UniProtKB/Swiss-Prot annotation:
This is Cytochrome c6. Signal peptide: none annotated. PANTHER family: CYTOCHROME C6, CHLOROPLASTIC. One of its GO terms (molecular function) is iron ion binding. Monomer. The gene is petJ. The keyword Chloroplast applies. Functions as an electron carrier between membrane-bound cytochrome b6-f and photosystem I in oxygenic photosynthesis. The keyword Metal-binding applies. GO terms for cellular component: chloroplast thylakoid lumen. It is found in: Plastid, Chloroplast thylakoid lumen. PROSITE patterns: CYTC. Heme c binds at residues 10, 13-14, 56.
Length: 87
């Protein structure tokens, strides 16, 4: 599932929804609204996963289509839930 994809591929930089590379660019709903083109939507999150931005690598061609969809859904859900207050 998405949690496993995240743990295996994203958590090095985004541990617990944070960001160890770029302060403030965390995975809370508020930060996603501010920093992602398109804001807090699954489409915007999926675009970021596929294409990367700045120090974040593109994952298209690395992750399978199913993994991209799963991790997108996971981040979307966590951003409005468990990670809502990450800063």
């Amino acid at each position: 599932g998405g949690a496993d994809v995240f743990a295996d591929n994203c958590s090095t930089c985004h541990v617990n929804g944070g960001n160890v590379i770029s302060a403030g660019k965390v995975l809370s709903k508020t930060a996603i609204e501010e920093y992602l083109d398109g804001g807090y939507t699954k489409e915007a999150i999926e675009y970021q996963v596929r294409n990367g931005k700045g120090p974040m690598p593109a994952w298209e061609g690395v992750l399978s289509e199913d993994e991209i969809v799963a991790v997108t859904d996971y981040v979307y859900t966590q951003a409005g839930g468990a990670w809502a207050n990450v800063s």
